[in-house]
Regions:
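Single conserved hydrophobic/aromatic residue that forms the stacking wall/gate
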Residues: 1-12
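Domain-terminus/edge residues, biased toward the C-terminal soluble/receptor-binding domains
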Residues: 18-207
Length: 207
């Protein structure tokens, strides 16, 4: 029940086919949540071995011993799904999560994961175009003690996009007129982020 509720919170809902137990997107979302919400527990996934009752078990994620940037996450195998690996790596402050499913062997899943991570780090970058500390605009307030209010975002906006020399453009739309009373974090518009004229993200504009 707890797991089902947590999955709903992470928007893990319908399955694409009645015979599928999960999807790569579901596994990636679960991995991201584990890394973000439970850092103290996530550290266990980088352990290469564990000894209990005089029995040593070795981590089957062999990339932990071959790539210092890899610090997790979970291997798996079923007859139907084949060999799989959900991995995560961090290089120069950028973290990526990869999901490989349906491999024919442990060697294959390791090679595919390494290739996928290398591709991601080579051709993608993580940008932080908006921070909560920055005021994006000011707007007129009607029927209030203050005539102007500063507007921005409440959470840092983090985007992982294909590498490009193009900058991120910001468009701010305010749902005017703004009439008092206004409360902190009230949504009063939207912020649209664009690269080369294409929308890459939209977030609420807040007081």
């Amino acid at each position: 029940h707890v797991l089902r509720r947590r999955q709903r919170q992470m928007c893990i809902r319908d399955r694409p086919h009645p015979d599928h137990l999960s999807t790569a997107r579901d596994l990636a979302a679960t991995a991201v949540a584990a890394i973000r919400d439970h850092p103290e527990r996530y550290a266990v996934y980088r352990e290469q071995s564990y000894t209990y009752n005089d029995i040593t078990q070795y981590n089957r994620n062999h990339l932990l011993r071959e790539d210092p940037s890899v610090d997790g996450l979970k291997t798996g195998y079923t007859r139907v799904a084949g060999y799989g690996l959900v991995a995560s790596a961090k290089r120069q402050g950028m973290r990526l999560v990869s999901v490989v499913m349906g491999s024919s062997s442990t060697a294959s899943r390791k090679a595919e994961t390494r290739s996928l991570l290398n591709y991601g780090f080579r051709f993608f970058e993580t940008l932080r175009p908006l921070t909560p500390e920055a005021s994006l605009t000011e707007a007129r307030v009607w029927k209030g003690q203050s005539k102007q209010v500063a507007l921005g975002v409440t959470d840092e906006v983090v985007l992982t996009l294909p590498r490009s020399t193009a900058s991120i453009d910001t468009q701010v739309e305010v749902d005017e007129p703004l009439v008092a009373p206004l409360n902190l974090n009230d949504v009063v518009g939207r912020v649209t982020l664009l690269r080369d004229g294409e929308i890459v993200s939209e977030v609420p504009l807040r007081v």
